Amino acid sequence: MTPLLELKDIRRSYPAGDEQVEVLKGITLDIYAGEMVAIVGASGSGKSTLMNILGCLDKATSGTYRVAGQDVATLDADALAQLHREHFGFIFQRYHLLSHLTAEQNVEVPAVYAGLERKQRLLRAQELLQRLGLEDRTEYYPAQLSGGQQQRVSIARALMNGGQVILADEPTGALDSHSGEEVMAILHQLRDRGHTVIIVTHDPQVAAQAERVIEIRDGEIVRNPPAIDKVNVAGGTEPVVNTVSGWRQFVSGFNEALTMAWRALAANKMRTLLTMLGIIIGIASVVSIVVVGDAAKQMVLADIRSIGTNTIDVYPGKDFGDDDPQYQQALKYDDLIAIQKQPWVASATPAVSQNLRLRYNNVDVAASANGVSGDYFNVYGMTFSEGNTFNQEQLNGRAQVVVLDSNIRRQLFPHKADVVGEVILVGNMPARVIGVAEEKQSMLGSSKVLRVWLPYSTMSGRVMGQSWLNSITVRVKEGFDSAEAEQQLTRLLSLRHGKKDFFTWNMDGVLKTVEKTTRTLQLFLTLVAVISLVVGGIGVMNIMLVSVTERTSANDIPMDVGAGASYVLYHLFFRYPCKVLPAVGGALGITLSLLIAFTLQLFLPGWEIGFSPLALLLAFLCSTVTGILFGWLPARNAARLDPVDVLARE
């Protein structure tokens, strides 16, 4: 009869400083299907090392080990895990149950890595627990079970994928005598069903119940009686779980790992909340500062635009403060007409101004009287609360009409509902009111100067008696570069005057400077917020590093149930909060930032607080990457461990 497990000259050594310590010394052993074998020996004899090699948790340094005729030395880590999963079931002295899973869920674990569908897993787990007398304990957690019940759960787990070979490491060592007898009775039943049972023990009473007792001493077999010729294999032990594709195993394991992650979060609510708090605060800080900072920037830019954006002012002289008489009359009405004909000009308005007294009945105030064209209000984005601007007929006829600002309207006509049509004195000239320009609300503050506007032809011809302009304001068409327009304007007037006796002031340059300044400030504030996010990420990293490091012990790495290195990797990475926790924290942080923004909107109604999808996405990705980076690395290191090293940590 061909042996099920065949070992020839197996040697296993471990480094100890500069030397190699040989633990197994030429072990040759055959174990047949359906046998119940006990391996006995004192502590340090090598029996546990032999068990690990038998169960494909470790590889021999030299020698040949065949399982059902297959040489395990030719298999890689994942293929070895598959062989282990399909042929072996482990029963440990300390049970190695997952504390946050129920008895039923613990039994299901081996089938998760075999790719079995959830419904099939559930039915199989319930069947096994019922067979072992735990049908009323399926929803109990390990802490709610006695030692004997926990060991029965571990036996059911060992049988989940068929368990052709049951390896029991001191199965009664942590149990009282009654529970120990129950466990041994179950092992006898498994033998009767056709399972091969290998018991590793130092208890002679337990070993005596086996059909064959193999004794090992100092790494060598000192007693190895022959196998019994007639072995009961009537039951057969074909694997319950059929081999499935790697992709199906991955998808099944991935889904189950995410489910386990949520269970882990729910089982430790306070720790979960405290761990997420750093991420929540960091995300909320980043998003809130970006959103509020952008709103503040838009507010400032709106104020700049209210002054007149995309405009170029032309003044006589070399620069501000130049009062040289030869330059005061540099700008003429013909210059205005020439500028208005340029293709890049949306509108152009002249300006002549003088401080005058305004009178209505017994009210007398000082104001700045400005001669402008009807386009002036469009250039500066001003609107009217009453009436309208000048028309071309009024400009050509030097009409005695005037537009008031809201401050003058309030002082001259405090009790009138409609002032259009009223007549006031501008200096000594009577003028009819045709409109009231709406006051511009600005976070930069409103001007204290009272202003009125008259047609520039009226101002220069009837009031001031001058034929030149104090300034010209040009609004550049949308789509034209303001800097290029300024160059063309300078070239045009220089050619007309034969010299450069004027200077320009481009508001677009001011706007760009303000934008650059606000961007710098916003970047600074964002960096401050990012620091808080990094601090929160470091806290999460610490928790995850500790969690993953702690969970590389055998009771949390499923290598003992046949998970390969790739499955251990995503088991640790996805099952624990390494991905779920930062993602949830990021979502809660974004929610908190939305609440903060809406609250600010109530207290700052003038601010247009909007949310950038890019900012929200980047903040969320940042928190998720934190979990990926600081969860993946420890999980990868854990996946590279040999199963026997993992078991040794317990």
UniProtKB/Swiss-Prot annotation:
EC code: 7.6.2.-
Tagged with keyword Cell inner membrane: yes
Annotated binding of ATP, by residue: 41-48
GO molecular function, one term: transmembrane transporter activity
Gene3D superfamilies: P-loop containing nucleotide triphosphate hydrolases (3.40.50.300)
Keywords: Antibiotic resistance, ATP-binding, Cell inner membrane, Cell membrane, Membrane, Nucleotide-binding, Translocase, Transmembrane, Transmembrane helix, Transport
Membrane topology field: Multi-pass membrane protein
UniProt keyword Transmembrane helix present: yes
Entry-linked Pfam families: ABC_tran (PF00005), FtsX (PF02687), MacB_PCD (PF12704)
Taxonomic superkingdom: Bacteria
Domain ABC transporter: 5-243
One GO-annotated biological process of the protein: response to antibiotic
Location in the cell: Cell inner membrane
Transmembrane stretches, start-end: 273-293, 523-543, 554-574, 580-600, 613-633
GO cellular component: a single term: plasma membrane
Assembly: Homodimer. Part of the tripartite efflux system MacAB-TolC, which is composed of an inner membrane transporter, MacB, a periplasmic membrane fusion protein, MacA, and an outer membrane component, TolC. The complex forms a large protein conduit and can translocate molecules across both the inner and outer membranes. Interacts with MacA.
Protein family: Belongs to the ABC transporter superfamily. Macrolide exporter (TC 3.A.1.122) family.
Biological role: Part of the tripartite efflux system MacAB-TolC. MacB is a non-canonical ABC transporter that contains transmembrane domains (TMD), which form a pore in the inner membrane, and an ATP-binding domain (NBD), which is responsible for energy generation. Confers resistance against macrolides.
Name recorded for this polypeptide: Macrolide export ATP-binding/permease protein MacB
Organism: Shigella dysenteriae serotype 1 (strain Sd197)
Lineage, opening ranks: Bacteria, Pseudomonadati, Pseudomonadota, Gammaproteobacteria, Enterobacterales
Encoding gene (name): macB
